[in-house]
């Protein structure tokens, strides 16, 4: 098992949920956390514990991005007009690594981050290797010509376990996608319940 897969499944076990809806997730076989005594850890969480868990789950979904980067995203969401939780989701879904994953060019968010880092992606015709690049409505994201035959990409396009959301238009023949709009929370197809309102409460303490 690759380091990327180990990290992905470690997050699933830590959360006790299959947060990406993957068929091979270990939590499909058991309902307790990692470690020999993981099954003993269940109990009623405090309000702080519930908020912390909501933050860890949302942060984990996007590739377990650093706390510094996640908090910076939250602070930007809080400065914007409107609902902070909605803004937070919109900013996270606008990340280039999230768009590549949602477009089904790669099988996991972790693969997306590595794919971008290795220079396989163009945005509006220019190579971009910044995972956190903020996509804007109308941006065209495509797999570079030399990268289109990578097994990683071909396998992902064939996966039927998740659909491309309506805020992204994807052409899998051309390996090209357009970021149509910043989504509302209700538009985002999470495999498990996410609670951005609790994340806001966590940082508002």
Curated annotation (Swiss-Prot):
Disulfide bonds: none annotated. The keyword Transmembrane does not apply. GO terms for cellular component: small ribosomal subunit. GO terms for molecular function: rRNA binding; structural constituent of ribosome. SMART domains: Ribosomal_S4, S4. Residues 1-16 have a biased composition (Basic and acidic residues). GO terms for biological process: ribosomal small subunit biogenesis; translation. The keyword Ribosomal protein applies. InterPro entries: Ribosomal_uS4, Ribosomal_uS4_bac-type, Ribosomal_uS4_CS, Ribosomal_uS4_N, S4_RNA-bd, S4_RNA-bd_sf. Keywords: Ribonucleoprotein, Ribosomal protein, RNA-binding, rRNA-binding. It holds the Pfam family Ribosomal_S4. Residues 94-157 form the S4 RNA-binding domain. Residues 1-46 are annotated as: Disordered. Part of the 30S ribosomal subunit. Contacts protein S5. The interaction surface between S4 and S5 is involved in control of translational fidelity. One of the primary rRNA binding proteins, it binds directly to 16S rRNA where it nucleates assembly of the body of the 30S subunit. With S5 and S12 plays an important role in translational accuracy. Belongs to the universal ribosomal protein uS4 family. This is Small ribosomal subunit protein uS4. It comes from Bartonella quintana (strain Toulouse) (Rochalimaea quintana).
């Amino acid at each position: 098992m690759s380091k990327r897969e180990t990290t992905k499944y470690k997050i699933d076990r830590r959360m006790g949920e299959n947060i990406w809806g993957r068929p091979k997730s270990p939590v499909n076989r058991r309902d307790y956390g990692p470690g020999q005594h993981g099954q003993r850890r269940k109990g009623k969480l405090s309000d702080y514990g519930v908020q912390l868990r909501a933050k860890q789950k949302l942060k984990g979904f996007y590739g377990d991005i650093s706390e510094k980067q996640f908090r910076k995203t939250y602070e930007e969401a809080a400065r914007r007009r409107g609902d902070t939780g909605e803004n937070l989701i919109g900013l996270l879904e606008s990340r280039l690594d999230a768009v590549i994953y949602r477009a089904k060019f790669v099988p996991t968010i972790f693969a997306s981050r590595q794919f971008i880092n290795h220079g396989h992606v163009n945005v509006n015709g220019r190579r971009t290797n910044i995972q956190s690049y903020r996509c804007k409505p109308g941006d065209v994201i495509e797999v570079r010509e030399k990268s289109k035959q990578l097994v990683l990409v071909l396998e992902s396009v064939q996966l039927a376990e998740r659909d491309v959301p309506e805020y992204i238009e994807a052409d899998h023949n051309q390996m090209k996608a357009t970021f149509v709009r910043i989504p509302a929370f209700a538009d985002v197809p999470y495999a498990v319940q996410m609670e951005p309102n609790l994340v806001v409460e966590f940082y508002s303490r």
